[in-house]
């Protein structure tokens, strides 16, 4: 009996299923890649199918083909051992085997080409912001939304979170497997906890584009605010921010002194808001230690604690994923003309509506659409008629403010993640510069405002026009609290950036 004439080894259910999977997967890969190239569609779930699911399906199919053939051959060798040799014979003089060999070579070349192209494109896909930000849509929506409106919106996620080199690429992908599992099993945190553990040092990533020596002199900055009153009175703070020192000077000074000098610290909490210990390495190699006088650490605690060397991220901890307070967002929208400052109490009312708790984005949008026009119809009916278009435009922008800074599904709001730049809503600079960190000889880390910024001018309802302001004037008279209390103690508690709101509000 000639077994080949009756049926080949590949004619079995397992091998046929493998053939079917391989052919279908190949067709789908080619079709979807062609569609992406022709239409320009870059959808994360299409990428997941094309670069992972379909190649996996192809490989599985090609594994099933020889498994099925091997099972049939073993079975036939058991039945007719004299006609089936222990090992396959490759005889190129046999036309049938020659054709099979040519088919095998061509199929292998096609397989390698398809898998190679899919692997390269798959690698590029995993490096894309589409993969990082949109594939796990619910989990990453807050971060992706913040990135889209950030100063680094044209910088890919991997350039900061992974950086150059194969070592950190492998580490990132291995860490990513744990995160994928957390998403699949819904075991991730609400909200995502920060700072991220084992994040690549900022000197390896941030300093690919930025480095402390690049920023020399000061930078003028004007902060525009509006009082939460009927007139939305404009307030203006004009400052010189002392970023660095004199170009090519050996004297480190300004804000970036912290990076030019070796500074280490110990934080009590995960978010690094409570810093009881700071150590500065002097040029002669000696170490100067500053201890919190109110809550000092013992020597034993210092020895056991994790010491972190200060880098960019200790101040610029939200360089891209930035969430802004409703008050600050309203200031920016009013000064840009997107929201009409002529609408009475528009800042106060909008902030109050935005700060209400909502179960979903849809509920928040519905509340904004209802409450803002209702407020003007009830309290300022003439304004509601004359400025109906401005009110509708304000509604659209307030909804956008909510969408960019509040994410109920992930339990994220603008205040969830402290931003250490400045000291307005969080302690920021005052974590160390609080006047309470002292050395054993009595030297303190100064809280002098002029160390980091210098007042050029200020305008406000309580400042006479034309008056030259050299020191900051608070919009409300708070006495010595201006110097004895941190800004964030009041502003974060009230979720506002300015005092002076009086009269109607409460939509």
UniProtKB/Swiss-Prot annotation:
GO terms for molecular function: electron transfer activity; metal ion binding. Binds 4 heme c groups covalently per subunit. Induction: Constitutively expressed. Disruption phenotype: Disruption of this gene eliminates the ability of G.sulfurreducens to reduce soluble Fe(III) citrate, Fe(III)-EDTA, and insoluble Mn(IV) oxides, electron acceptors with potentials greater than 0.1 V versus the standard hydrogen electrode (SHE), but the imcH mutant retains the ability to reduce Fe(III) oxides with potentials of <-0.1 V versus SHE. The imcH mutant fails to grow on electrodes poised at +0.24 V versus SHE, but switching electrodes to -0.1 V versus SHE triggers exponential growth. Growth with fumarate as the electron acceptor is unaffected in the deletion mutant. It is a multi-pass membrane protein. Heme 3 binds at residues 152, 449, 452-453. It is found in: Cell inner membrane. The chain crosses the membrane at residues 14-34, 45-65, 100-120. GO terms for biological process: anaerobic respiration. Heme 1 binds at residues 132, 136, 140, 400. InterPro entries: Cytochrome_c-type_ET, Multihaem_cyt_sf, NapC/NirT_cyt_c_N, NapC/NirT_cytc_sf. Pfam families: Cytochrom_NNT. Keywords: Cell inner membrane, Cell membrane, Electron transport, Heme, Iron, Membrane, Metal-binding, Transmembrane, Transmembrane helix, Transport. SUPFAM superfamilies: Multiheme cytochromes. Heme 4 binds at residues 487, 490-491. Heme 2 binds at residues 157, 160-161, 496. One of its GO terms (cellular component) is plasma membrane. PANTHER family: CYTOCHROME C-TYPE PROTEIN (PTHR30333), CYTOCHROME C-TYPE PROTEIN NAPC (PTHR30333:SF1). Belongs to the NapC/NirT/NrfH family. Redox protein involved in a high-potential metal respiratory pathway. Is required only for electron transfer to terminal extracellular electron acceptors with redox potentials higher than -0.1 V. ImcH likely transfers electrons from the quinone pool to a periplasmic acceptor. This is Cytochrome c-type protein ImcH. It comes from Geobacter sulfurreducens (strain ATCC 51573 / DSM 12127 / PCA).
